[in-house]
C-alpha cells in the first residue's frame, strides 16, 4: 500500500554521550527518523523522503523497511556524505554539540576515530548533495494525504510544499530550521507559510525570530499566523506546548506528559510526527497536540529513534486519555 503520510528530512549518524547510561556511538538518527517513529506510534503507512551517501549503512535502511516504513523515497547517492551528529548531555539534560574531544576526555573515554574531523552543523558548509528536491518524491507518494517537513533551508521547504500540492495531500506541517527563524529571514516567511496547516517552532526559535520586537509568546504566535498558516504550535520543552488557532484566535496550554527523562534527543521531532497523526484523525489541532505530546513522552524515556515503537501495547492510548484532562484553554 502506498504511504498516506510523508516525512521529509535528514538521516544522520549519531554520536551521543547521555546524561546517564552508556555512550551510543555511530547509531541511526536524524530528524526524519524521529518524526517517522513518532508518527508510527499511531499510523502504519509512512513514507520516508531523504538522501544518504553511498557510505550510509545498508543494514540501517533494511531495518527501516522491517519496521514497516516505505523507504522508496530515500535516495542513495553515488558519493559519500558526512552526516555525523554529536550530542553531549549534562546532568540537567542540557545538550552541547561542539568540541567532542573535550567531552570524551572529561568522561575518561577513548575518542572514536570515526569522529575525527567532526564539525558541528553550524560551522561546516552545507553539503548541497544532501538538499532535497521535488524530484526526490516518488510518483506514488503524491497520493498521500499529509506531509511533514523537518528543519531544512527555507527555499527547499517552500519548493517541496509547492511540489506536494500537485498531488492529493491537503495537510502540511512544518518545523523550521534555526536559519529560518531570524529577523533577517522573517520577510521570507509569508511565502513559506501560506497554505501550511501547522507551523511547529520551538519557543527559543520563536523568540529569536522576534528578538527585541516582542516578548510575549502568544503575541508572537498571532503575528506568525498572519503569514498564512492555520495553526501555530509552540514547543516549550518540559512546559509542554502552546496552541494558537489563526481562524478563531483561541489559545490552549497543554502540559508535557510527566515522563521519566532518559534521553531527550528527538523528542521535539517525535512530537511533530504524533501531531500529524492526531490532527488528521478529525482535523482538530488540539487532538494533534495531544497525540504529539504522547509521542514525545515515549521518546523521552528511552534511547534511539525507535524506542517509542517498542513500549508496552496500550501505553500510548492510556497516556492520551490521561492527558486530555490536563488541557487548559487560555
Predicted feature descriptions by range:
Residues 36-45, 278-281:
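Alpha-helix C-terminal capping segments
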Residues 37, 85-87, 240-244:
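Short beta-strand scaffold segments in enzyme catalytic cores
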Residues 144-222, 240, 246:
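Conserved beta-alpha-beta core of the PfkB/ribokinase-like small-molecule kinase fold
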Residues 21-37:
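Short catalytic helix/loop segments, enriched in acidic residues and glycine
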Residues 1-3, 146, 185, 214-330:
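Conserved phosphate-binding/catalytic region of the ribokinase-like
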Residues 39, 202, 268:
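Short, conserved phosphate/pyrophosphate- and ester-handling motifs at nucleotide-, phospho-/glycolipid
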Residues 13-21, 45-146, 317-330:
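Conserved N-terminal subdomain of the carbohydrate kinase-like
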Residues 1-19:
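Positively charged, low-complexity intrinsically disordered leader regions
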